[in-house]
Amino acid sequence: FWARMATFAAIGLGGGAGRLLGGYIADRMGGTFLTMAAMGLSAVCALIVGFFYGGAPLLTFALCFIWGVAVVADSAQFSASITELAPKDRIGTMLTIQTSMGFLLTLTTIHLMPLAVDAFGWRYAFMALAIGPVLGVVAMARLRAHPDSLRLANGRR
């Protein structure tokens, strides 16, 4: 029972908090800043969460809650970037592709994680989940450095 409640809290409540906090930060500091910070935090959580396996449940929950906040905080920024940077006649198609790719990546990850756990154990399997956020930080940094990024969020990038 408690494991299910903790999962709901980390994903449902943490995710909700992440969306609100992410929007607030993005409005004030810019979407690329928020996205890089959220993905960086998500990568750190992925790198260390496996080492909490079998340890203190409250510490594990706290880390997973933080991860739940971070993992969704950037989601809206991708859609916002598309709507602000894409040619107007392609926005719908690009949003559809972006959303579909997100679901495909999530589905693939969910199915590959048991194989990673079997091969490497809980402590190390989660480390693979840091790859995506690290690459995302690099991609967002490149976007932030591009002149077109000034078209994002009224110039706040």
Question: Positions of the model-derived regions?
Answer:
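Loop-to-transmembrane helix entry
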Residues: F1-L13
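Residue-level signature of mid-helix packing/kink "hotspots" within the transmembrane helices
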Residues: G12-L20, T106-L107
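Helix-to-loop junctions at the C-terminal end of transmembrane segments
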Residues: R19-G30, V117
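Residue-level hotspots within transmembrane alpha-helices of multi-pass secondary transporters
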Residues: L20-Y24, H111, V138
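C-terminal transmembrane helical hairpin of 12-TM major facilitator-type secondary transporters
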Residues: M29-S81
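Multi-pass alpha-helical transporter architecture, strongest
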Residues: G50, W122, A128-R157
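A late C-terminal transmembrane helix in Major Facilitator Superfamily
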Residues: E84-A119
